[in-house]
């Protein structure tokens, strides 16, 4: 069949594997697309090829394209639309292509949840759901769960003779609460919903504990743990073999060899038993007896080698001892008794889960709401039916979808779960060898297991499919990376060839998995990857684990700040693809990646102290923001004014403005009773003269409070919030404070949160406050409102998960010495998709508890899955870098850690030993041992190549490996003693005796005159608009322009002035619409109204600005000849920022300084279009023309042309410099009157 596929066009940019992925057909296809391999482009091209296929074209609505996010779906649609429009340019008469463009908006290109929603909306009558259902808010969902669970448990507690339930409570709850039991029920419910048949999965949990008539050999847990026993015995054998090699060295302790050989024989016996059965190992473990080491005279042998030999032998013995204590200290039948004893308790637990699921579903149904797991299960319910043997098979609806979809394409397939896989299976053909399923993903980037994604689905098909597709599915590897420099790729490959394998890591990092260079970069300086290992400071300044973490974060932040400043200040260059040239690095080119965000605030603080602009999208801190805290206290007081702390906080806040003395005076009027009662009593009496001001403040607030309380009983919560904002003036007040925009954004988020809350099934201020409290109790604080644009020139801090799919020129991966989060392994109960439920055996009567076989097996399985997931997270982090990769980690004792890491140097194979990889507790435990086997670490180690093979030691990668002393990072700047004394004297306003040698210096400083006086009256940095005004100015004095720009003195603060959009604000709003209007859609009133509403939702426009937009004027532009040219242009760029150097005499007409001086000019070009014959520059103007010029536009035209000529000339100059192409035409477009002026030089 392969010869029927279209051949790759000559001169095509596609690689052979990419082309194969574009055109391969006739079977299920799995594309393993490495990071930066262009998978989205391949996916789009495949869709386009199917749509415009000459022999058998497929309508776009006969394709189901499943993406991971809504943003990805929209991007996919946009790319397909752009590609179809290009085809239409070449084939303007093609009705088929026009039809596809019209079908595109209706096409099934969406997330799996959107597809499920589409199915449910179409076939809701097959389900017991209200067709008007809504998607539940996450917090509302959690509150409903708690409500349902509380009711169920209350009923259970009220049942007499409920013996098994109370046994369950005794075993899994504390004396104080049954929170642990609730957590178990909710966890089992959540895990079960990740399976196509939740009840069946729950039943299997119970069946696993029914061991009647079984031996330990029949248990899946024992079979799995035996594999772990073999693994640990093999590790012990490796230690003994290594010890034997050392003992046999010329100056090694040769008398130890005989004992070590006996140890190997003992371990061999245990390993043989492990290959037989659990019982065999148990019996062998009871007979373990280690020989006593023969005494030797240590002075006869190399002392270091003797120590190494004895240490390795002790490690081996510890491995066996651990097995004896954990697994073989109890007889096999006692493990079976655990299962028998726990079986009825687990049965009751599962029954509670089923009752909970039923009640929870019923409550959601009554409230007309569904959650995201419901979407999947309802869709699956519609697409499946039960066969005679009890298995699921496609329903009639599923068969309709099978007939409809010519192909199903799944992006990010590695993040699919079992339920989603079942849905996909029911709408695609059964046979893999004749299938129509196309899957794209990279299992090495599967990092969402915590969301119940199942990378095993991808891995199973990758192992099963072949590259030829013979007899089954086909797999295609896209290994070429078009993102990164060779140094980044080679560095990543070097690490992962050593740490990622099937046994530990779930994936073989073989030749097919390796990243291959696909990008072309100019030669760069200092592009080697780096590992900077910080030795923590020895000073015991900070106690405790939390304090140590703070210090580590500060050390790493200080080092990163130094590196960033050095790179920016030195003009470190990165490649700019748009201009195809190297340019100086900017702050926006840097990203700091962290596994999680606890360190982010400290890192931000340190970078800010160093003068580095930085941004992190923190998931906490919202409710801690002062303005939010104050408002929440206002609402608490409205709900219940008898609460002293919230009321005192409001009275002390800027809203009322009492000081400490006034608050004390109020309390003195009534030492008993609440603050509210005292305030009411105080206001009833006649105030003393000195208390008049206090009385007025309280009376004003008291009256407002009564009005709010009445309003809250009758009106909506969101209206109440806005009323409070307005009547207190607090919203305007915070706008006038530092970071005012951020503060106002935070208050708007509170308002929006209230509106979202009112869209749920809950109502009222009291429930809203409880709703917020539950959010905080669960630690679900939100981040502060976003007040930063994507293009801001700042260093970004984000989690590795957030960075997936992104790329940055310079990447710092920090916190590599932080321990992996293993808290899930420490829980009282464990859940696993395959092994079910595991917990300690707890006997409340005897007050004993001990580990069970199921708990040990699940813990081991989860640990290995965690290790594999962390490897994939590290892979994602390293592959974000385009040009420079810098890895940073902190250790407490570098010498001790290096001694541990150096064990890897004795290993001669690429893949490090399993025990090193599985025993890692942080990323450095993988990275450092890998790099210590490379020649570039020799500057640090000075150990030579030793036994490391040439292909590893001399691998083609460049690294800088360095240990940094933390003391040098935290050392304060030296201060001269003399200078310090002078400062102290000045602070105390003492006369300072002037030494004779200082007299001349003081005189020179006092009499000094600046040599560039001219430059002080002219700015070194100007905007184009300011230069335009300068040219218009008729005043001739040197300082006239600058004086003219000074803000006028206002009689009232701006935030207290009466609001109303200025001409400038209206102009800004129009420009915002012109920037964001979708040129791919028809420009109609309805479309524009929808887009403007979307801009308001995204906070790109305010409500007031949106109301001021004259939509008909925007449409008039696009109906004009110039507007039609914009719609038809090859490319359109809008709101293009630029910076350029300009001779001072060009910017300032009055310049009299040196002729070589330059100034920095900044501006933003409204619109530039590229047409076949060149570039046209367009500037939009909202000047009022009609009625302002008696002679109409004819009189206005020459005036306006002169007014804006300089501005457009500078824009054109900037474009010509950056694009290296002349600007053929410069146009002014005036919305008032729909006028166009072509500006000539």
From Swiss-Prot:
EC numbers: 3.1.-.-, 5.6.2.4
Pfam families in alphabetical order: PDDEXK_1, UvrD-helicase, UvrD_C
CDD domains: SF1_C_UvrD
InterPro entries: AddA, DNA_helicase_UvrD-like_C, DNA_helicase_UvrD/REP, P-loop_NTPase, PDDEXK-like_dom_sf, PDDEXK_AddAB-type, Restrct_endonuc-II-like, UvrD-like_ATP-bd
Domain spans labelled UvrD-like helicase C-terminal: 505-805
PROSITE patterns xref list: UVRD_HELICASE_ATP_BIND, UVRD_HELICASE_CTER
Record GO terms (molecular function): 3'-5' DNA helicase activity; 3'-5' exonuclease activity; ATP binding; ATP hydrolysis activity; double-stranded DNA binding
Protein name: ATP-dependent helicase/nuclease subunit A
Organism: Bacillus cereus (strain ZK / E33L)
């Amino acid at each position: 069949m392969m010869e029927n596929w279209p051949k790759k066009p000559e001169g095509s940019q596609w690689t052979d594997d990419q082309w194969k992925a574009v055109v391969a057909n006739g079977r299920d296809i799995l594309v393993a697309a490495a990071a930066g391999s262009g998978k989205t482009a391949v996916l789009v091209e495949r869709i386009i090829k199917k749509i415009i296929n000459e022999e058998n074209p497929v309508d776009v609505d006969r394709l189901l394209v499943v993406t991971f996010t809504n943003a990805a779906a929209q991007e996919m649609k946009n790319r397909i639309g752009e590609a179809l429009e290009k085809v239409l340019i070449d084939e303007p008469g093609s009705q088929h292509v026009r039809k596809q463009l019209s079908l595109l908006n209706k096409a099934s290109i969406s997330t799996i949840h959107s597809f499920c929603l589409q199915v449910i909306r179409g076939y809701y009558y097959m389900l017991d759901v209200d067709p008007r259902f809504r998607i539940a808010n996450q917090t509302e969902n959690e509150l409903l769960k708690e409500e349902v669970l509380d009711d169920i448990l209350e009923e259970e507690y009220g049942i007499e003779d409920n013996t098994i339930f109370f046994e369950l409570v005794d075993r899994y709850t504390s004396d104080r609460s049954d929170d642990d039991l609730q957590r178990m029920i909710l966890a089992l419910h959540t895990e079960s919903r990740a399976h196509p048949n939740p009840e069946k999965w729950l039943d299997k949990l119970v069946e696993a504990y029914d061991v009647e008539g079984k031996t330990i050999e029949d248990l899946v847990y024992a079979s799995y743990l035996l594999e772990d026993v073999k693994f640990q015995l093999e590790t012990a054998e490796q230690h003994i073999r290594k010890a034997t090699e050392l003992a046999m060295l010329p100056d090694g302790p040769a008398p130890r060899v005989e004992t070590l050989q006996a140890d190997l024989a003992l371990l061999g016996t245990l390993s043989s038993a492990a290959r037989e059965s659990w019982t065999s190992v148990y019996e062998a473990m009871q007979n373990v007896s280690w020989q006593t080491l023969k005494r030797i005279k240590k002075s006869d042998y190399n002392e270091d080698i003797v120590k190494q030999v004895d240490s390795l032998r002790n490690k081996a013995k510890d491995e066996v001892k651990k097995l004896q204590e954990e697994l073989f200290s109890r007889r096999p039948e006692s493990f079976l008794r655990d299962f028998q004893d726990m079986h009825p308790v687990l049965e009751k637990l599962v029954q509670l889960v089923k009752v909970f699921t039923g009640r929870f579903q019923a409550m959601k149904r009554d409230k007309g709401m569904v959650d995201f797991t419901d979407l999947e299960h309802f869709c699956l319910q519609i697409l499946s039916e039960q066969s005679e043997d009890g298995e699921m098979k496609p329903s009639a609806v599923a068969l309709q979808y099978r007939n409809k979809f010519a192909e199903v394409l799944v992006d990010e397939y590695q993040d699919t779960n079992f339920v989603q896989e079942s849905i996909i299976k029911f709408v695609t053909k059964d046979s893999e060898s004749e299938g129509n399923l196309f899957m794209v993903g990279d299992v090495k980037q599967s990092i969402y297991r915590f969301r119940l994604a199942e990378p095993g689905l991808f891995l199973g098909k990758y192992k099963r499919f072949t590259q030829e597709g013979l007899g089954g599915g086909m797999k295609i590897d896209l290994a070429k990376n078009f993102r990164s420099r060779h140094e980044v790729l080679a560095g990543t490959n070097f690490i992962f060839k050593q740490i990622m394998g099937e046994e530990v890591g779930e994936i073989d990092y073989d030749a097919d998995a390796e990243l291959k260079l696909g990008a072309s970069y100019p030669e760069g300086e200092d592009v080697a990857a780096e590992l900077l290992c910080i030795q923590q400071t020895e000073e015991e300044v900070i106690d405790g684990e939390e304090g140590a973490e703070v210090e580590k974060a500060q050390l790493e932040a200080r080092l990163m700040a130094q590196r960033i400043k050095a790179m920016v200040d030195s003009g470190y260059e990165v490649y700019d693809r748009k201009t195809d040239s190297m340019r100086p690095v900017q702050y926006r080119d840097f990203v700091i990646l962290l596994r999680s965000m606890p360190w982010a605030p400290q890192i931000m603080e340190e970078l800010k102290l160093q003068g580095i602009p930085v941004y992190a999208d923190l998931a906490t801190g919202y409710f801690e923001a002062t303005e939010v805290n104050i408002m929440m206290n206002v609402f608490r007081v409205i709900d219940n004014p008898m609460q002293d702390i919230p009321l005192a906080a409001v009275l002390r806040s800027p809203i009322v403005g009492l000081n400490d003395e006034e608050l004390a005076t109020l309390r003195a009027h009534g030492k008993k009773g609440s603050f509210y009662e005292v305030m009411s009593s105080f206001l009833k009496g006649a105030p003393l003269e000195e208390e008049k001001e206090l009385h007025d403040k309280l009376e004003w607030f008291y009256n407002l409070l009564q009005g709010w309380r009445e309003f809250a009983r009758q009106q909506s919560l969101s209206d109440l919030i806005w009323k409070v904002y307005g009547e207190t003036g607090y919203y305007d007040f915070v706008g006038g404070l530092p970071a005012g925009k951020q503060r106002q954004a935070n208050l708007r988020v509170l308002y929006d949160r209230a509106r979202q809350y009112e869209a749920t099934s809950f109502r009222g201020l009291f429930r809203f406050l409880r709703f917020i409290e539950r959010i905080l109790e669960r630690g679900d604080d939100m981040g502060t409102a976003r007040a930063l644009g994507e293009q801001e020139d700042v260093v970004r801090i984000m989690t590795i998960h957030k960075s997936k799919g992104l790329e940055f020129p310079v990447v710092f991966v920090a916190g590599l010495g932080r321990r992996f989060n293993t808290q899930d392994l420490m829980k009282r109960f464990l859940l696993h998709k395959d092994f079910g439920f595991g917990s300690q055996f707890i006997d409340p009567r005897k007050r004993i508890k001990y580990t069970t076989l199921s708990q040990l097996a699940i813990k081991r399985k989860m640990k290995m899955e965690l290790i594999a997931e962390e490897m994939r997270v590290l892979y994602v982090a390293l592959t974000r870098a385009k040009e420079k990769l810098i890895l940073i980690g902190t250790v407490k004792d570098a010498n001790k850690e290096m001694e541990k890491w150096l064990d890897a140097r004795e290993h001669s194979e690429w893949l490090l030993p399993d025990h090193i990889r599985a025993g890692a507790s942080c990323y450095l435990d993988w990275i450092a041992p890998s790099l210590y086997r490379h020649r570039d670490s020799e500057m640090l180690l000075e150990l030579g190549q030793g036994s490391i093979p040439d292909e590893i030691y001399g691998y083609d990668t460049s690294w800088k490996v360095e240990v940094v002393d933390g003391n040098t990072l935290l050392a304060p700047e030296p201060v001269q003693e003399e200078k310090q004394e002078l400062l102290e004297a000045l602070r105390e306003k003492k006369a300072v005796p002037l030494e004779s040698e200082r007299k001349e210096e003081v005189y020179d400083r006092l009499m000094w005159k600046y040599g560039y006086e001219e430059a002080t009256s002219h700015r070194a940095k100007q905007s184009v608009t300011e230069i335009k005004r300068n040219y218009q100015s008729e005043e001739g004095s040197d300082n006239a322009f600058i004086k003219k720009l000074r803000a006028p003195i206002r009689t009232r603060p701006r935030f207290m002035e009466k609001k109303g959009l200025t001409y400038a604000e209206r102009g800004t709003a129009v420009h915002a619409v012109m920037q964001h209007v979708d040129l791919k859609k028809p420009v109609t009133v309805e479309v524009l109204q929808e887009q403007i509403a979307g801009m308001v939702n995204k906070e790109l426009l305010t409500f007031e600005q949106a109301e001021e937009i004259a939509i008909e004027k925007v449409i008039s532009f696009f109906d004009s000849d110039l507007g039609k040219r914009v719609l038809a242009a090859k490319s359109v760029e809008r709101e293009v920022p630029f910076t350029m150097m300009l001779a001072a005499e060009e910017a300032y007409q009055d310049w009299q300084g040196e002729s070589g001086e330059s100034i920095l000019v900044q501006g933003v070009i409204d619109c530039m279009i590229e047409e076949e014959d060149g570039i046209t520059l367009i500037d939009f103007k909202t000047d009022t023309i009609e009625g302002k010029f008696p002679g109409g536009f004819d009189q206005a035209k020459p005036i306006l042309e002169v007014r804006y000529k300089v501005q457009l000339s500078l824009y054109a100059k900037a474009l010509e410099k950056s694009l290296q192409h002349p600007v053929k035409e410069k146009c002014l477009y005036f919305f008032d009157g729909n006028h166009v002026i072509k500006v000539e030089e």
